[in-house]
Curated annotation (Swiss-Prot):
Keyword Hydrolase applies: no
Compositionally skewed regions (Low complexity) per UniProt: 290-310
Recorded GO CC terms: NuA4 histone acetyltransferase complex; piccolo histone acetyltransferase complex; Swr1 complex
Key words of the record: Acetylation, Chromatin regulator, Growth regulation, Isopeptide bond, Metal-binding, Nucleus, Transcription, Transcription regulation, Ubl conjugation, Zinc, Zinc-finger
Subcellular localization: Nucleus
Annotated zinc fingers (PHD-type), start-end: 345-394
GO molecular function terms attached to this record: methylated histone binding; zinc ion binding
Name used for this protein in its record: Inhibitor of growth protein 3
Annotated family: Belongs to the ING family.
Pfam family, one: ING
Organism, as annotated: Pongo abelii
GO biological process, one term: chromatin remodeling
Length: 403
C-alpha cells in the first residue's frame, strides 16, 4: 500500500514537471518573438519571471528524484527481508532432510519450461516467417501446453501423497542374501542413506510430514504464473508455522515407533515360521525332524542377525537425523547473530545502519540528516553549523543562480 501511494505521488510530480516545462518553453518562444517590440523593463521582468519558474520546476524534479531513491530503498529492504526468510526456510528444510530444496527447485524449473512439440520443425519448416512476426498458429501451440503442465503438477502431487502414506506404514527393511527360497519371509534391501529422494525419505526423521510439506510447496508453485517461483516455498513454511505442534508430534512418534514396528513384524514372522515348521516335523520321520530342526535353527539365527542389524540401522538413522538437525540450527543462529534487522533505518551516503560516531546535517530539508564520521571525512565533532556535501553543493548551486 505504501509503495503504491509513493508511485502515485511520483507520477503526479512527473506530470507536474512536464506540464511546467511545456508552458515555460511556450513562454520562452513568445518572449523571444516579442522582445524587440517591447521596452527593456518589460524584457527584464519577463526574463526574471521565466527564470523563477524554471528554478521551481528544477526543485520539483529534485524532489521527484529523492522520492525515487526512497522507493528504491523501500523495495531493496523488502527484498532483503524476503531473501533472509527464504534462506532461513531452506535451512530448516535442509535440517530435516538434506537435498530436498534442490529437488523442489529443480522440479519447479521443470514445470516452468513447457515441453516442445516433436513435429515443431516439420510443421513450420516450409513457411519462412520472421521471429518477431505474430503467428497465430504458434500462439495457439503455446497455449495448448497449459493443461499438460497442470496434469504434470497433479500427477506429481498424487505421487508425493502416495509416497508419504507408504513411508508411514512400512518399517525397516534389510536384504538377507543367505536366506533360502523355502523361507517364509524375504526382506528387501533399503536404500542407502546417501541417496535422497522425495519418494524414499528416511522414516526415522518424519518422512510423512516432510513429504506433505513438499507437496504443499509444489502445489503453491504450480498455482503461480510462469516466472520466478523460488519464493513459493513460503507456502510450505506457513504450513510448518501454523501446524507446528502436530508436525513435532508426528516427528517424535515416527522416531519412537521405527524400531518397535520393525522388530515386532520380524518377531511375529519368526513365531509363525516356528509353529508351521514344528507341525510339519511332527508328521515326518525322525531323520527329517533332525534336518528340519537344524534348518530352523539356521533360519532363526539368520533372522535374529537381521533383527539386530535392523535395530542397529534404526539407531544409526536416529543419530544421523539428530546430528543433521542440531548442526544447521547452530549455523543458523550464528548467521542470525551477524545479520542486522532489515527494518532498521538507513543513514549516511553509504546507505548503512547507525554505528560508531555520527554527525547531523544542520539543513532541515536534508533527506539523509545523519552521517558517519568516516564517510564525510571527519575525525572529531565540527564546531558551529555543519552541512553535508550534498546540501553544500545544492546551496552553492542556488547561490550561483541567484547571482
Amino acid at each position: 500500500m505504501d509503495l503504491r501511494d509513493r508511485f502515485t505521488e511520483m507520477r503526479e510530480m512527473d506530470l507536474q514537471v512536464q506540464n511546467a516545462m511545456d508552458q515555460l518553453e511556450q513562454r520562452a518562444s513568445e518572449f523571444f518573438m516579442n522582445a524587440k517590440k517591447n521596452k527593456p523593463e518589460w524584457r527584464e521582468e519577463q526574463m526574471a519571471s521565466i527564470k523563477k519558474d524554471y528554478y521551481k520546476a528544477l526543485e520539483d524534479a529534485d524532489e521527484k528524484v529523492q522520492l525515487a531513491n526512497q522507493i528504491y530503498d523501500l523495495v531493496d529492504r523488502h527484498l532483503r527481508k524476503l531473501d533472509q526468510e527464504l534462506a532461513k526456510f531452506k535451512m530448516e528444510l535442509e535440517a530435516d532432510n538434506a537435498g530436498i530444496t534442490e529437488i523442489l527447485e529443480r522440479r519447479s524449473l521443470e514445470l516452468d519450461t513447457p515441453s516442445q512439440p516433436v513435429n515443431n520443425h516439420h510443421a513450420h519448416s516450409h513457411t519462412p516467417v520472421e521471429k518477431r512476426k505474430y503467428n497465430p498458429t504458434s500462439h495457439h501451440t503455446t497455449t495448448d501446453h497449459i493443461p499438460e503442465k497442470k496434469f504434470k503438477s497433479e500427477a506429481l502431487l498424487s505421487t508425493l501423497t502416495s509416497d508419504a502414506s507408504k513411508e508411514n506404514t512400512l518399517g525397516c527393511r534389510n536384504n538377507n542374501s543367505t536366506a533360502s527360497s523355502n523361507n517364509a519371509y524375504n526382506v528387501n534391501s533399503s536404500q542407502p542413506l546417501g541417496s535422497y529422494n522425495i519418494g524414499s525419505l528416511s522414516s526415522g526423521t518424519g518422512a510423512g510430514a516432510i513429504t506433505m510439506a513438499a507437496a504443499q510447496a509444489v502445489q503453491a508453485t504450480a498455482q503461480m504464473r510462469e516466472g520466478r517461483r523460488t519464493s513459493s516455498l513460503k507456502a510450505s513454511y506457513e504450513a510448518f508455522k501454523n501446524n507446528d505442534f502436530q508436525l513435532g508430534k508426528e516427528f517424535s512418534m515416527a522416531r519412537e515407533t521405527v524400531g518397535y514396528s520393525s522388530s515386532s513384524a520380524l518377531m511375529t514372522t519368526l513365531t509363525q515360521n516356528a509353529s508351521s515348521s514344528a507341525a510339519d516335523s511332527r508328521s515326518g520321520r525322525k531323520s527329517k525332524n533332525n534336518n528340519k530342526s537344524s534348518s530352523q535353527q539356521s533360519s532363526s539365527s539368520s533372522s535374529s542377525s537381521s533383527l539386530s542389524s535392523c535395530s542397529s540401522s534404526s539407531t544409526v538413522v536416529q543419530e544421523i537425523s539428530q546430528q543433521t538437525t542440531v548442526v544447521p540450527e547452530s549455523d543458523s543462529n550464528s548467521q542470525v547473530d551477524w545479520t542486522y534487522d532489515p527494518n532498521e533505518p538507513r543513514y549516511c551516503i553509504c546507505n548503512q545502519v547507525s554505528y560508531g560516531e555520527m554527525v547531523g546535517c544542520d539543513n532541515q530539508d536534508c533527506p539523509i540528516e545523519w552521517f558517519h564520521y568516516g564517510c564525510v571525512g571527519l575525525t572529531e565533532a565540527p564546531k558551529g553549523k555543519w552541512y553535508c556535501p550534498q546540501c553544500t553543493a545544492a546551496m552553492k548551486r542556488r547561490g550561483s543562480r541567484h547571482k
